[in-house]
Structures are given as structure tokens and as C-alpha cells.
Amino acid sequence: MPTIKQLIRNTRQPIKNVTKSPALRGCPQRRGTCTRVYTITPKKPNSALRKVARVRLTSGFEITAYIPGIGHNLQEHSVVLVRGGRVKDLPGVRYHIVRGTLDAVGVKDRQQGRSKYGVKKPK
């Protein structure tokens, strides 16, 4: 507990909340261009080849974004929309690519959870 003298000398600092997605600069999504599309392996105990893309955003940041869903059409110079949201077993991946917008097409033959993968309602 500080004394009154200590509080006069320097006031209490407000707690600053740190953003989990700084590259978005407070926006819900950002547009970017893929500079590299590749796969990485998750940390223990999981095992897979997770599809990720290195994306240069309009905010100037270069980030690593996860490509959700089965199969994708992304390659270098593809324009994508990026949202926040980390992938728990991929260290350093703090963003997701939004499927069904710009150059990222929706997941083929998706029946359930379609809105998360940019798929229209089947006729």
C-alpha cells in the first residue's frame, strides 16, 4: 500500500489492455496479399500439416494467417481478407483467413457450419 507522499510523487497508472491482434489496428478485418503459402506442423501432442499463408496487410504488417477448411485455392499474390483468432497448436499464428471473400473461395461440398467457410445454401 503506497503512502500519500508516494501517490503525490507519481500517480497510479491505469491498466492498459493489450490487443491480441495488433496488425488489424482495431479493425474487425483487414485486406492483404499472400506472399507465401505453405504448411507447418503443430506443436506436441498434435500431428498434421496445417495450411498457412504469409500475408502482407494494408496496415503494413506481414503476418502468418491460418487457412481454415479442407482444400483451398490460395497462391502467391492472392488477395485475402484476414480476421483475428489464433490457432492454439500453431505458435505465432494469430489470424485466420476469411473463406468465401475476395480470392479465397468457400470450402467445396460443405454441409454443416457453412457460414464459417463461405458456402452458400445448397438448392
From Swiss-Prot:
Compartments where found: Plastid, Chloroplast
GO biological process, one term: translation
InterPro entries: NA-bd_OB-fold, Ribosomal_uS12, Ribosomal_uS12_bac
Coarse class of the protein's main subcellular location: plastid
GO molecular function: rRNA binding; structural constituent of ribosome
GO CC aspect terms: chloroplast; small ribosomal subunit
Keywords linked to the UniProt accession: Chloroplast, Plastid, Ribonucleoprotein, Ribosomal protein, RNA-binding, rRNA-binding
Function: With S4 and S5 plays an important role in translational accuracy. Located at the interface of the 30S and 50S subunits.
Oligomeric and partner information: Part of the 30S ribosomal subunit.
Family: Belongs to the universal ribosomal protein uS12 family.
HAMAP family tied to this protein: Ribosomal_uS12_B
Full protein name: Small ribosomal subunit protein uS12cz/uS12cy
Lineage start: Eukaryota, Viridiplantae, Streptophyta, Embryophyta, Tracheophyta
Name of the gene this protein is made from: rps12-A
